[in-house]
Amino acid sequence: MNYPNGKPFNRNKTKVGRTNDHKSSKIKYGGRGMTLEKEIELSNDYYLSIGKAVIHKKPTPVQIVDVSYPKRSKAVIKEAYFRTPSTTDYNGIYNGYYIDFEAKETKNKTSFPLQNIHEHQVMHMKAVHEQKGIAFLLIRFKTLDEVYLLPYVPFEYFWKRYQQEIKKSITVEEIRKNGYHIPYQYQPRLNYLKAVNKLILDESEDRV
C-alpha cells in the first residue's frame, strides 16, 4: 500500500470494498448498553457454534504475590495483581487465516485517542502482519454507536504520526475512509468477519 505525499492512500474500491455506508446501514439493533467486549464475545460464540471461526479473548495475565496453603492439597491466593497484557485482546483462526486484533471503545465523538494503545501491542500487530496474518483494531465510537475495523497498514501510518508528535489521535473521518464499517445486526450482533472478508479481498487485489 502506497502513501503519496505522506498521507494514507484511500482506495476507492467497488462496493464490496471499504465504503462509507455508516449512515445508510444503521439498522437499530445497536449497542443497547453492551460493552464492545461483550458484543465481540457474543459474536465469537455464534461463529464457533456454526463452525465459522475459532476466535477467543486472550486471558489477562495475573501476577501472584502471596499464596497460603491451609491444606496440603489446596492453595489459596491471598494477593494478586492484573498485569498489562503483552499482546492484543483476541486471536484465532478463520477460514485458514490467522486473526489477531485489539478492541477499543471511546466516548469521543470526533476522534480516537492513540494513548489508548500501547507500543508493545503495535509491535505485536506488526509481527503478525509480517507473517501474513490478519491484524487490525476494532474501534467503537460509543456515543455515535458506530464500530469500525481499522487494518494494521493504515493504522501504522497514524501510529507513526503519533510517535512523531504530529497528531495524538485518529479522526473519525480518517477511520471511516481507511477502515470498514461494521453495522449491527441480529445474528451475530457484530459481524466483523464480513469486514475481514472485505479486507482480505482488498489486500489480494493490492498484490495483483
UniProtKB/Swiss-Prot annotation:
Residues 1-25 are annotated as: Disordered. GO terms for molecular function: endonuclease activity; magnesium ion binding; nucleic acid binding. One of its GO terms (cellular component) is cytoplasm. Its EC number is 3.1.21.10. Belongs to the RecU family. Its main location: cytoplasm. Its cofactor is Mg(2+). It holds the Pfam family RecU. The keyword Nuclease applies. The record marks K104 as: Transition state stabilizer. It is found in: Cytoplasm. InterPro entries: Resolv_RecU (IPR004612), Restrct_endonuc-II-like (IPR011335), tRNA_endonuc-like_dom_sf (IPR011856). Keywords: Cytoplasm, DNA damage, DNA recombination, DNA repair, Endonuclease, Hydrolase, Magnesium, Metal-binding, Nuclease. GO terms for biological process: chromosome segregation; DNA recombination; DNA repair. Binds 1 Mg(2+) ion per subunit. It comes from Staphylococcus carnosus (strain TM300). It catalyses: Endonucleolytic cleavage at a junction such as a reciprocal single-stranded crossover between two homologous DNA duplexes (Holliday junction). It is an enzyme of class 3 (hydrolase). This is Holliday junction resolvase RecU. Endonuclease that resolves Holliday junction intermediates in genetic recombination. Cleaves mobile four-strand junctions by introducing symmetrical nicks in paired strands. Promotes annealing of linear ssDNA with homologous dsDNA. Required for DNA repair, homologous recombination and chromosome segregation. Mg(2+) binds at T87, D89, E102, Q121. HAMAP family: RecU (MF_00130).
